Amino acid sequence: MAKEHYERTKPHVNIGTIGHVDHGKTTLTAAITKVLASKGLAKEQDFASIDAAPEERERGITINTAHVEYETEKRHYAHIDAPGHADYVKNMITGAAQMDGAILVVAATDGPMPQTREHILLARQVGVDYIVVFLNKTDLVDDDELVDLVEMEVRELLSEYDFPGDDIPVIRGSALKALEGDPEQEKVIMHLMDVVDEYIPTPVRDTEKPFLMPVEDVFSITGRGTVASGRIDRGTVKVGDEVEIVGLHEDVLKSTVTGLEMFRKTLDLGEAGDNVGALLRGVNREQVVRGQVLAKPGSIQTHKKFKGEVYILSKEEGGRHTPFFSNYRPQFYFHTTDITGVIELPDGVEMVMPGDNVTFTVELIQPAAIEKGTKFTVREGGHTVGAGVVSEIDD
């Protein structure tokens, strides 16, 4: 019999479970797959298989992450769950698993704990704007008023980090009971997924965002002009489009795309994910360099000063062996090039140890085409020592 063809009929959303260790993130993930599998919408995955997450490498950093997929009536989901706290930190900062929204799991027996706070802060910093709360283990708390108190604490904590704490949906239940087949708790899981369907919006697809292509290579074709090549990061581009060449200089160069090629064939339209060469009108070979970006006019500017949320590799991961202090000057690899920058640590942080995550301010020696959400690596002599994301533009 012929294999079924995978039809992408439903909108796709990336989510993940976040929260303190042992509050039930993986149990909830397993319960979601089990309950949806009974409706024919998922393949059931047990706790052990999710917990034994495979190692991945993203930008030179080893991360353990479990990827689970399932569907609801309305959507297709890719769900990430990470076994260790450090894996979450690395995942969120490197964007190895881009989340459109998250389910924050809080045990009603414990209430918010240090990692609950840290994951909420990370979600805020890296741009996960939508959170649904699952108050887990409510079956182990005899007094409903205690659960009300925990809910209030979680809402206050979310508000503290500029999430709409009063409006965020909070679902109460027991992931373990649902996993064990308790019909009431299975209903709770279905209700949770209905809420996730409703509350977490479908993301804007990369192709619908403004065009951006980091320049990897530049060459000239005699008699035709200058070609900039690279992988389109977002948006689309077609022959005749006006573009700006942004980065490394204060001034922005304007041009028009007069030709597009992919795999040595001409192309009418390039879109996010394509590796293309763009022929640029009226631009000299010397005016475009690797590390700049081609972008839709007005969509991105250059900046020198920004705040970054950064994970610093441990010695075992091939990172530094010693701490660093303010005025440390490594290279910041944005898009396709290294730019030296000076780090200023926040008040009260004297030094940063290998294996830490930290928010610090950077002043680059050359302007880069960056915005909130731009990913970067921190490098020293060509070695990756950290990975980060721009959390705020400061100049």
Curated annotation (Swiss-Prot):
Keywords: Cytoplasm, Elongation factor, GTP-binding, Hydrolase, Magnesium, Metal-binding, Nucleotide-binding, Protein biosynthesis. Residues 174-176 are annotated as: G5. Belongs to the TRAFAC class translation factor GTPase superfamily. Classic translation factor GTPase family. EF-Tu/EF-1A subfamily. Its main location: cytoplasm. InterPro entries: EF-Tu_GTP-bd (IPR041709), EF-Tu_GTPase (IPR050055), EFTu-like_2 (IPR004161), EFTU_2 (IPR033720), G_TR_CS (IPR031157), P-loop_NTPase (IPR027417), Small_GTP-bd (IPR005225), T_Tr_GTP-bd_dom (IPR000795). Mg(2+) binds at residue 26. Residues 19-26 are annotated as: G1. The keyword Electron transport does not apply. GTP binds at residues 19-26, 81-85, 136-139. It comes from the Bacteria. It holds the Pfam family GTP_EFTU_D3. Residues 60-64 are annotated as: G2. Its EC number is 3.6.5.3. It is an enzyme of class 3 (hydrolase). GO terms for molecular function: GTP binding; GTPase activity; translation elongation factor activity. This is Elongation factor Tu. The keyword rRNA processing does not apply. Residues 10-204 form the tr-type G domain. GTP hydrolase that promotes the GTP-dependent binding of aminoacyl-tRNA to the A-site of ribosomes during protein biosynthesis. GO terms for cellular component: cytosol.
